Design a protein with these regions (language model features):
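Basic, amphipathic alpha-helical bundle interface domains used for macromolecular binding and assembly
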Residues: 15-26, 41, 48-58, 270-271, ...
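Short loop/turn elements that form and flank the Walker-type P-loop nucleotide-binding site
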Residues: 40-43, 80-81, 111-113, 131, ...
């Protein structure tokens, strides 16, 4: 950032491809300087934001612009701030407000060797776990100036350990609340253990949504590196409340079925991240899957396969990570009661086929586990014993995930769902009987090669849950079972 003070009519001009919010900082900065007890220079000021060909967005430039003007006018002298990062939005009275994107800016500065960080108090907790920094949380422009002059130094933000953040995570919906549903609970545990995509098909009120909302409680907490990735995306999107620290619980995003392609994938004038990126390292829950538009569903295919999504706009292009578990639920027909034992379906065969055909074959191929969720009889609810809690199930899931992380430590992946074809051959050995069973199922069920690969990965997860190094027939049989809805609803 550069400031040039020239003779002429008093004015403040900001150049360097600023957006509207940066241009508006002229009035905010001028008022903040005066109302903080300083003097706005009576000269023509030009603020240059380099590089000139990169668009500058957001009000985070307010504080550094104000400090630069005070230095250019001689009200701040004798200090070198080239190794200090400043950011923050100024109000008209000079107070500082938090800004979105603080975490990625601080991480980028740290990677360039910058240690001293001055930012709004509302952003301090967001960066408290980043080691090796001196973070000074400020409440106003006046406080920043007094700190720089050495009159009233701002206390350095106390650094936090990420383990303290993890210990504060609490389960929102406990699996102990789910009565019955033995098969669905098992499928949920398998999906969580391997990071697999899951589709639940069942009548209204059968418990599909509650099962999905139990998933974050049985998934292991985010690792520190995963937390940085996920929190960075949420910070860019402005989804972090002021005073919020790093995220430890895996995100659970549940967009409405009216969501557009832009809101799902990302977009807008500033190329903001969409739901697939906000769900990075977590869960993207699509309730009433066939109700989403065809374009929106088809747009999911690329991030599901690659784990990244590119958002291109006129002035900038951004690439966001989007490695998530997709969990979807749907009714078996438009009225919801096809195959129900208690209510009669009112839909014609044509209506049911049209409804199911809203989900394309390529998208179905990318869903590893398909399970039917039937309504639980009232007698089973009233007489059933206590179900396992999320803590009990989560302990088993964490054990399996730790096994996978150790196995893939040199391969750059974390769980079985991320295996590619080459790694599958390396890490998924099968007994001859299991191989024969799988080949027979592929021929009879008409599986694509993608579906075949996903059955192998699910079988690897089931074997891990059993503590087996080699995949056996029971593991393959259960994995094949999770593809049977293909034949019942889509290929029948």
């Amino acid at each position: 950032m550069e400031v040039y003070a020239a003779t002429g009519m008093p004015a403040l001009e900001i150049i360097g491809l600023p957006d509207a919010s940066v241009k508006e900082s002229r009035d905010r900065v001028s008022a903040a300087i005066v109302n903080s007890g300083f003097t706005m220079p009576i000269s023509r000021l030009t603020v240059n934001l380099a590089p000139a060909d990169q668009r500058k967005e957001g009000p985070a430039f307010d504080l550094p612009i104000a400090i630069s003007i005070l230095m250019a006018s001689g009200q701040l002298e004798g200090m070198d701030l080239t190794q200090t990062l400043m950011l923050g939005e100024l109000s008209l009275d000079g107070s500082l407000h938090p800004v979105r994107g603080a975490l990625p800016m601080v991480i980028s500065a740290s990677e360039q060797g910058i240690v001293d960080i001055i930012l709004p108090e509302g952003n301090a907790e967001e960066v408290a776990c980043i080691q090796g920094l001196r973070v000074y949380p400020a409440s106003s422009l006046r406080q920043v100036v007094n700190h720089l002059k050495g009159r009233e130094p701002i206390p350095v933000q106390q650094q936090r350990q990420y383990s303290d953040v993890v210990s504060a995570v609490k389960c929102a919906v406990d699996m102990a609340q789910v009565q019955g549903q033995v098969g669905a609970r098992r499928a949920l545990e398998v999906a969580a253990s391997g990071g697999h995509n899951l589709l639940m098909v069942g009548t209204p009120g059968s418990g599909k949504t509650m099962l999905a909302r139990c998933l974050p409680g049985i998934l292991p907490p985010l690792t520190f590196s995963e937390s940085l990735e996920t929190t960075r995306i949420h910070s860019i999107a402005g989804r972090l409340a002021p005073g919020t620290g790093l995220m430890a619980e895996r995100p659970f995003c549940a967009p409405h079925h009216s969501a557009s392609v832009a809101s799902m994938i990302g977009g807008g004038s500033n190329a903001k991240p969409g739901e697939v990126s906000l769900a990075h390292n977590g869960v993207l829950f699509l309730d009433e899957l066939p109700e989403f538009s065809r374009n929106t569903l088809e747009a999911l295919r690329q991030p599901l396969e690659d784990g990244v999504v590119s958002v291109t706009r006129i002035h900038n292009q951004a690439q966001y990570q989007s490695s998530f578990m997709m969990v979807a639920s749907m009714n078996p027909c438009p009225c919801g009661f096809y195959g129900s034992k208690t209510k009669k379906c009112r839909c014609s065969a044509k209506d049911i086929r049209r409804y199911l055909d809203r989900i394309s074959g390529p998208l179905l191929d990318r869903i590893d586990i398909q399970v039917e969720v039937d309504a639980v009889p009232v007698k089973e609810i009233s007489e059933g014993g206590a179900a396992e809690s999320s803590a009990e199930v989560g302990a088993r899931v964490r054990k399996v995930r730790e096994l996978q992380q150790a196995r893939y430590a040199q391969d750059g992946i974390h769980c079985n769902a991320q295996l590619d074809a080459g790694l599958s051959k390396k890490y998924c050995p099968m007994t001859p009987e299991a191989t024969a069973l799988l080949h027979m199922a592929v021929e009879r069920m008409g599986m694509s090669m993608r579906a075949y690969g996903r059955v192998v990965k699910v079988a690897r997860t089931i074997a891990d849950m059993d503590g087996a190094d080699i995949i056996g027939t029971t593991h393959v049989a259960e994995a094949i079972q999770y593809r049977e809805l293909d034949g019942k609803y889509w290929k029948g």
